[in-house]
Amino acid sequence: MTRRRSRPSGGAGRRERARAAGLQKPQAPEPQPPPPSLEAGAGAGPPEVPAELDCDGPREEEEPKLAPGPQVPPTSSQSVQTCCLLCHRERKGWEEGPSQNGLVLQGEKLPPDFMPKLVKNLLGEMPLWVCQSCRKSMEEEERQTGGDHAVAISLSHTSCKSQSCGGDSHSSSSSSSSSSSSSSSCHGNSGDWDPSSFLSAHKLSGLWNSPHSSGAVPGSSLGSPPAILGEAFPVSEHHQHSDLTAPPNSPTGPPPHPASLIPSHPGSFSSASYPPPLPTTPVAPFPAQASECPMAAATATHPSGPCQSPHPPSTSMPLLKMPPPLSGCSHPCSGHCSGHCGGPLLPPPSSQPLPSTHSRDPGCKGHKFAHSGLACEADEGLGEEEDSSSERSSCTSSSTHPRDGKFCDCCYCEFFGHNAPLAAPTSRNYTEIREKLRSRLTRRKEELPMKGGTLGGIPGEPAVDHRDVDELLEFINSTEPKVPNSARAAKRARHKLKKKEKEKARLATEALKQVNRVSGSQEPRPARERLLEWPDQELDRVNSFLSSRLQEIKSTVKDSLCASLSMCELSVESSGFKEGTVEAQTLTPSDLSGSSQKRPDINLDLSPLTLGSPQSHTLQAPSEPVPPWAERRDPHPPPWTEVRGPPPGIPENGLVRRLNTVPNLSRVIWVKTPKPGNPSSEESSKEVPSCKQELSEPVATGGKPKKSKRQGSQAKKTLASPAPWSPANLEASGAKSQVSSPKQPSKGSEPAKVGSGAEPGEGSPGSRPGPIQADSPKTDKKGSSWQNWPGGAKARTLEQESEQTPGPARPQSLSQGKGRSRRSRNKQEKSASSLDDVFLPKDLDGVEMDETDREVEYFKRFCLDSAKQTRQKVAVNWTNFSLKKTTPSTAQ
């Protein structure tokens, strides 16, 4: 309050000085106003501080500065020079672009960023910049100078000084030093304002100046603050800050400011009355400067709060009403800038110093809307009213003037203001705003207790609850309270319950799914999924069964292998072959075609049992279907077991041998996979003469068209080359499936015995590991199957190697006597090459093949690659592990 009072008193002196200086300054500054505008823009900010600090000194400095123009004014009367210079500059620039001080020219568009800052700055700056004395000085300077530059400079300096005298100009000029005190007191936001904000304010002031130039002298007052703004945004900003500070203080002590403003403003007012002519005169001689000067004058008037006062009535008005002067200031701004909406808007910020807060917000807009002094006065009244309700008034003022409705009271945003005044309304009367806020808070607090009371059951006594403890506990624990708070609790409880229910449902569904998976999940699942899972399930089933039956099978296989080995050594293949190929012999009568047809079935059975069987089939020309069968086996492990039925079929001696040698295994497989099982094999054997029948039957019996097709293809191959099969069977199928064609039962019998002994081994291990290692049937046949069956597998491998050698012989030879395998190899040197043909994939290019054969070749490739990889991985990994174990330090 003391600061404000001192400001007013100092402001009065300053304004008087400014007036005197204004008279003096205009002459010197006339030539220099344009340069000062440049310098003021740069250096106005700092000079303002001195102006504020020393009312007289700054005045004097301002006068000299006004004379030098841009250079001197920025320092001492920076606000004045800045306003004038900036007004000219900014006015020109702002006229070019959107007015950024919240005062938007009718044809201008304000950038959203500048709107708030400009509004705030203008609200703060316009009152500070536009002191009555400054206005008068500006007007007088304009008149005397006859040049817009001189008038603008003097007015700007005068306005700055008068503003400081009013506590606005000096506060603004000393905003650097005194912005915290006088400036901050004038404008609580002054500290917050940035030079950029000032720039926007300057731009706004420039806009105002353009309107002011077109408008009345009050506009020239405003123009002076814009000039300061243009001169140095910091300076104008300081002025604005003082104004902005003043608005907060002005709410605190609006009367002191009005008083101080009034005294200084009276001079201002007298000069304010001049400003109208000045703007008019400057407009004619120098429209740009005239408008700027009018803006400065308006600014000076606004700070005084008698922006209206600038008019004789407005002078009395500021004294009468502090808020009205603010609104009055804004009004004079609008009156001065009546032509320029932006002008009035900016002036309210300038007038903001004390009343300027009010005038800045609604007053400015209202005044803006009122483009004449009368309108300003009317706006003054409105300004007071608006001051009382700055927010509402700001909106009202904006509503009064459509152009002014671009700024919002709270954030000064031009878009959401819906005709809200500039920043002035919020900043101009902080006391009223605070009171409103307090009242609102009080109402809310009252409403809250009412709500609490309703919760408690008694709206008036929310804290008191007469319910029993049990009731209270129930209420607290209840999930469905009817009270508002309880409603929230009930909501939460409901949400929790829903979540729990959802969780339970999800868990139940998951459990059901798991149960279905474990028990009958396949049934609900689509047939495709079931089929996909079927192989794995069958593999597990077969593996478990094989493991359980392993010992029995091993013993049986060992016996059969021993018999077959002895038979091979003694070259007594008939017995072994008969045993191993009882069904094979049956097929032999059925001819190669029949045997070949059965072979596919056997291959299907044996391949699932032992990967070696597909290999042996591969060895045979028609054995290619065996790999397809193996493929089927891979996708459908149960089919392999199903194929077990065909083993009785004699398609491949090895397979038949396996089945005969390991009848239990074949039976087990049969039991596990009864689909293709015996029916398929039996039917195939029965229908051996016709491959088509065999194929169709395996499909129907086995229920797996793939295998039946492959079998059929194999049968077709065998039928196509029945003669080759007799030798090819001995050689090609010598490895595993030496299908002793009916033509060559003796030769085939020996390999068949060995194959039967070895292949049963293969078959048993193969069927067991085969399902497990379906990916690499060859490897499983040779290595994994026999390795899995150390005893029986070895015997089998020996027999197979002796008879079949190449495919199964390799793993068999590795597992058991290589000598026997060598003997068999010697016997089957030709079959060795055939083994490569069988096991190694053939070039599919340029070769005519069935789809089944092609699938077999693909399967061979797959098996070969997988087998190699598996072997390499095992060897390398085991070696590394062993090395690491032996040398733990190295391993580490």
UniProtKB/Swiss-Prot annotation:
Biased segments, Pro residues type: 28-37, 248-258, 274-285, 309-321, 637-650
Modified residues annotated as Phosphoserine in this record: 764, 776, 882
Biased composition range(s): Acidic residues: 379-388
InterPro entries reported for this sequence: FAM193 (IPR029717), FAM193_C (IPR031802)
Chain residue ranges for the region called Disordered: 1-78, 164-192, 237-321, 379-403, 587-655, 671-837
Subcellular location(s) per record: Cytoplasm; Nucleus
Stretches of the chain forming a coiled coil according to its record: 485-517
Bias (Low complexity): 169-185, 391-400, 736-757
Gene Ontology CC entries for this record: cytoplasm; nucleus
Superkingdom classification of source: Eukaryota
Keywords on record: Coiled coil, Cytoplasm, Nucleus, Phosphoprotein
Biased composition (Basic and acidic residues): 56-65
Biased amino acid composition, Polar residues: 587-597, 610-621
Family stated for the protein in its record: Belongs to the FAM193 family.
Protein name (database record): Protein FAM193B
Native source organism of the sequence: Mus musculus
